[in-house]
């Protein structure tokens, strides 16, 4: 399909493989990767957490090389600095000990669960979460329960939001220790109390919830 589209639009097509990745080391805040494409890119620091960002960055580097082939001047330093400073609000975004992620569908919640289990395996975690009623599914409940020892639910600021108490009850039915908060501010305060000095707060769910939380935390949109 991609080959047909590229031929139709007279666009260059480049196929990449896992062999392109020479070295990769992921951590909770990003990754350091070395690639071999048309040139070698050594120790590229990625500011976006998540193993999938390694392949995304590989596509970026392939695009840079193609643009250079077409005559664009793009210094190596600009590429390294760009990847090291890239931000994506509410996508595995850290604010101190709070990890914010707009995981609002089964795939997103499973990816978040995998991330915290791989990168924060020995870290006590508290989940602060709010979802839309028409988005929540059974497998999401199971994965949310696996993310944290304690869960605080809130009602997102949206007409389609799932009531915090109803959400907490559903999580409890899946074995979680969950409680509902009357507001985002109350929920954040309770999550911080439960977290104490040693736990990470994972804040996940609807993008409406994540956006409101970012505003409450004073994070800039850029």
Q: What residues fall within each predicted segment?
A:
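C-terminal helical cap/extension that packs against the catalytic core
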Residues: 1-14, 29-31, 98, 106, ...
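Active-site-proximal loop/hinge segments that shape catalytic or ion-binding/gating pockets
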Residues: 206
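Short, active-site-adjacent cap segments at secondary-structure transitions
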Residues: 22, 209-211
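Acidic, Mg2+-coordinating active-site environments of NTP-dependent enzymes
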Residues: 1-43, 61-77
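Beta-strand->loop->alpha-helix junctions that form or flank phosphate-binding loops
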Residues: 5-27, 46-51, 78-85, 103, ...
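Nucleotide phosphate-binding/pyrophosphate-handling subdomain across enzymes
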Residues: 38-150
């Amino acid at each position: 399909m991609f080959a047909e589209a590229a031929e139709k639009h007279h666009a260059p097509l480049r196929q990449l493989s896992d062999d392109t990745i020479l070295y990769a080391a992921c951590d909770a805040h990003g990754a350091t990767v070395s690639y071999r494409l048309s040139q070698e890119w050594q120790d590229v620091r990625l500011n976006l957490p998540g193993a999938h960002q390694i392949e995304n960055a590989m596509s970026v580097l392939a695009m840079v090389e193609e643009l250079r082939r077409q005559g664009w001047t793009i210094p190596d330093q600009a590429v390294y600095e760009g990847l090291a400073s890239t931000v994506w609000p509410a996508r595995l975004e850290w604010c101190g000990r709070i990890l914010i992620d707009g995981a609002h569908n089964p795939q997103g919640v499973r990816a978040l669960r995998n991330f915290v289990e791989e990168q924060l395996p020995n870290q006590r975690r508290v989940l602060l979460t709010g979802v839309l009623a028409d988005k929540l599914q059974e497998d999401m409940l199971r994965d949310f329960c696996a993310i944290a020892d304690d869960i605080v639910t809130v009602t997102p600021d949206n007409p389609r939001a799932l009531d915090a108490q109803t959400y907490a009850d559903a999580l409890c039915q899946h074995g979680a220790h969950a409680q509902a908060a009357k507001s985002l501010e109350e929920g954040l305060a309770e999550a911080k109390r439960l977290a104490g000095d040693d736990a990470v707060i994972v804040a996940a769910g609807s993008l409406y919830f994540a956006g409101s939380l970012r505003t409450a935390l004073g994070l800039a949109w850029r």
